[in-house]
A protein has these predicted regions:
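Core catalytic lobe of class I
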Residues: 1-316
Length: 316
């Protein structure tokens, strides 16, 4: 199987041609529902109902599950959509701030069982559908942005986050927690030095106290040896990562740091990362920069050209 390649095809058709259990990790962000018209007959995101949109994505990711190794992980970036009037409203696709230019279809679709102005709940509808299809739903990571697109709404808070779902094919899967660990807070280190325990004011002689979160070995005479105080902690599930500008013609690119974090945790060095909605190639570039291989699938030939210019690689 070729790697470091960009495949110009529909995601489902291209995945069907890949061998079983051949890739280590998937990092992807499919087109969001009813927010942009890419002008392609087979595009995902322009379905008449949210249910049809969910069904199409589940079919794509069902095929992805076959292609993933048993220890593979799937990192899915998705955002929500508001139910509208069926006309072109004022809501902007968070991945496509300039995506309204030249639109030919309504961008705010009506949805069955939803009232006008309802938040449809696309991320969780998709997550539950994938879980029902056999995926292990392991984490809902909040991607928080300090520089979100401004919104003109006056009757709700402006949105500043998207979801990243971590899913796995099996109960046991590759996850390198150390690769994305984050520094402990200075106040936490200070508490360790003072001998304070989690949930207690002091570490010494607290009735019923056992080990202080597994680090009692570091304590000497009621205090902690600096050399043994932990400096890192497990990555939390709120990731503060700002969007970054991209000079190419594809406005849906998510930040490289986002893709890099997922790849570091979910794919071993030398492994293969796949993105069935490759766009301008952010996932592929991140994989290449981190000494992993990539397979990109993209239906839009113009985006394939952007990705090839950005990261190199073979196109088919």
């Amino acid at each position: 199987m070729k790697t470091d390649v960009i495949i110009n095809r529909d995601a489902l058709c291209a995945l069907r041609e890949l061998p079983d259990e051949s890739v280590h990790c998937c990092v992807t962000s499919p087109p969001y529902y009813a927010l942009r018209d890419y002008g392609l007959d087979a595009q995902i995101g322009r379905e008449d109902t949210p249910e049809q949109y969910i069904d199409r994505l589940v079919a794509v990711f069902h095929e992805l599950k076959r292609v993933l190794r048993p220890d593979g992980t799937f990192w899915l970036n998705i955002a929500d959509t508001y139910c509208g009037t069926g006309s072109k409203g004022g809501y902007t696709d968070p991945k496509n701030p300039k995506g309204r230019n030249g639109q030919s279809l309504s961008l705010n679709r009506r949805a069955p069982n939803c009232k006008q102005k309802d938040l449809i709940g696309i991320p969780w509808l998709l997550a539950f559908a994938l879980r029902a299809d056999g995926w292990y739903l392991r984490s809902d990571i909040i991607w928080q942005k300090e520089n979100p697109m401004p919104e003109s709404c006056k009757d709700r808070p402006s949105r500043c986050y998207e979801h990243i779902f971590l899913l796995a094919k099996s109960k046991q899967y590759f996850y390198d927690a150390a690769a994305i660990a984050e520094p402990i807070a200075p106040t936490t280190a200070a508490r360790y030095r003072q001998g304070r325990a989690a949930g207690h004011k002091y570490a010494e002689e607290v009735p019923g106290q056992g080990k202080v979160q597994g680090i009692n070995k570091a304590r000497k005479g009621g205090y902690y040896d600096d050399a043994l105080i932990p400096t890192m902690r497990n990555r939390r599930d709120i990731w503060l990562i700002n969007t970054v500008p991209y000079k190419g013609g594809h406005f849906a690119a998510f930040p490289p740091k986002l893709a890099e974090t997922c790849i570091l945790a979910g794919c071993p060095k030398g492994g293969i990362v796949i993105d069935p909605f490759f766009g301008s190639g952010t996932t592929g570039k991140a994989a290449k920069d981190l000494d992993r291989h990539y397979i990109g699938i993209e239906i839009n030939i113009e985006y394939c050209a952007l990705a090839r210019a950005r990261i190199g690689g073979e196109s088919t």
